[in-house]
């Protein structure tokens, strides 16, 4: 392979992983802030909100994990 195609592979992998991490960080921040807002408004529903928040954060975190898998596929295939 040429030098440029190898360089573009590394660039594409880093952009994919970086943007996914940025989007997940923003999404997690939004979910957690809104959950804390809801807990402050209705403290009696804190347990339900916390459980729902953990499920949401887990689903959001699945996106960067998949992006890292795609980045590795770009690099090694």
Swiss-Prot record:
Compartments in which it is found: Cell membrane
Transmembrane segments: 7-27, 57-77
Coiled-coil regions, chain positions: none
Site (Reversibly protonated during proton transport): 61
A Gene Ontology molecular function term of the record: lipid binding
Topology of this chain in the membrane: Multi-pass membrane protein
Family: Belongs to the ATPase C chain family.
Function: F(1)F(0) ATP synthase produces ATP from ADP in the presence of a proton or sodium gradient. F-type ATPases consist of two structural domains, F(1) containing the extramembraneous catalytic core and F(0) containing the membrane proton channel, linked together by a central stalk and a peripheral stalk. During catalysis, ATP synthesis in the catalytic domain of F(1) is coupled via a rotary mechanism of the central stalk subunits to proton translocation.
HAMAP family according to UniProt: ATP_synth_c_bact (MF_01396)
The protein's name in its UniProt record: ATP synthase subunit c
Species name: Lactobacillus helveticus (strain DPC 4571)
Gene: atpE
């Amino acid at each position: 392979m040429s030098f440029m195609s190898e360089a573009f592979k590394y660039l594409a992998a880093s952009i994919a992983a970086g943007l996914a991490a940025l989007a997940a960080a923003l999404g997690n921040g939004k979910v957690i802030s809104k959950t804390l807002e809801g807990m402050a408004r209705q403290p009696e529903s804190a347990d339900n909100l916390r459980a729902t928040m953990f499920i949401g954060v887990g689903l959001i975190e699945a996106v960067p994990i998949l992006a890292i898998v795609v980045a590795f596929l770009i690099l090694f295939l």
